Amino acid sequence: MFFHAMGVTGESSEPVAKYLQDRYFCILSTSTVYCKGQKYVSKADEVRQVEAYLKSQGVEHLELVVASSIGADLAMAFLTSTKLPIGYVFFDGGQFAQIGKGTRRVMAPFLYLAIKSLYWSKGGTLKKILWCDDDSIKPYFIAAGENLTYTNLRRQLSDSLEDKPFPSLPEELQKQIYFEFGSIEDHFKYRQAVMEAYPCGHYPVFEGYNHMQYQIRDPRGFAEMLTSIAEHNGMPKLPFIRK
């Protein structure tokens, strides 16, 4: 199951999922923030909707949960509330920021304009807010920007990335979680705090890589890495993993 990044739809995980779909049933959910005509109520409600969908599909076990960027915040809420057995978890550049309420309120209009501009410019402004502007990812930003409303984004930020201690996780679950960061991405600054909160987790660093770079630039390689984790509880020998 995939939890997507900010400013994109769930379809943004399709390039990776297509290399997994012959082996796994892949679920690519989209937050109500980016769904036309839907209202974001709360993080708890997002989790409720995910749980309801999984139940309706008869899902009794999740082999792997993959969460990218701010998707890590929602995935963590899911992990701490679900009763479903979970095999492994992979956080790609998880945005484990702890931001004060006032700052998040100030951020909302700027983020709204940034995401909407991607729709208005047909992806032309992507390089201004992300390290790359690959044509392969622009459609997901454009689709999200088209459906985004300021109210939904403001509501999401009201209960996401909160300035609170990280939720506790059982040691056994921590041992099944991979918290990956690129060494040159801005989110790398959260790594130490996450390591202190979850000392039993795995913390691979992709040397010289930016935010979600491996996933974006090499979805097949990224999918093969996820398969290695799910089937062998270990990272493959990638040349860019920090020794």
PLM regions and their residue ranges:
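Conserved HGGG/HGGXW glycine-rich cap/lid loop of the alpha/beta-hydrolase fold
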Residues: M1-K36
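Active-site loop/oxyanion-hole signature of alpha/beta-hydrolase fold enzymes
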Residues: L28-L64
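Gly/Ala-rich beta-loop-alpha elbow adjacent to hydrolase catalytic centers
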Residues: V66-A75
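Flexible "cap/lid" loop of the alpha/beta hydrolase fold
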Residues: T80-S117
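Conserved alpha/beta-hydrolase catalytic His-Asp/Glu region
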Residues: K101-G102, L118-E171
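Conserved serine/cysteine hydrolase catalytic core
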Residues: S158-E196, Y214-Q215
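Catalytic histidine neighborhood in serine/cysteine hydrolases
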Residues: Y198-M212
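Catalytic histidine-centered segment of alpha/beta-hydrolase-like enzymes
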Residues: Y209-F222
